[in-house]
Amino acid sequence: MTTNNNWGYRKTDTAWKTPYEIIALFADVVSTGGNLLLDIGPREDGTIPKEQRLILTELGAWNKKHEKAIFGSLGGIAPGHFYGPTTISKDSTSLFLFVQGQTSGTIMVKGLSNHIKEITVLGNGTKLKHKVVGKISWSPVPGLVYIDIPKGVQDKYITVLELKLDKPVTLYRGKGGFD
């Protein structure tokens, strides 16, 4: 991935990506278990353009704040369970949700069979509330998990939530309550 439109430095290329765009792409790549190759092209004199320094500084600060969800983590849960990138801790007992563009309100996770012990906003430690809706006691189909995100806890780029689970992540992938 380039930070503008060219690999290497080109004086006329001023179409810089924003830190948000790079961080969002990075979160998507990490959620699939991948690594992001990010091109940094120094000028002829060896200096790094200020636009690239900003991207690197912001990406580095965001990584440090959310390192628990990035370094040593595994690719996340299958698409459709949460609408955004996810990762899983190495022992699979924490699920990390990367919440993009959400200022406050409610997000939803589908098909999570686990009991959630605690939900924390990475980087600031805020504990969040959740509720499970639609779970029927006699059915293996889990309910929908709704997580309330209050105003003021969001990261300026992408907020990361840690769901601490009772056991390794278990997702319901069936077709209904009778299979």
Question: What label would you give each PLM region?
Answer:
Residues 1-179:
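Mature catalytic domains of secreted/periplasmic carbohydrate-active enzymes
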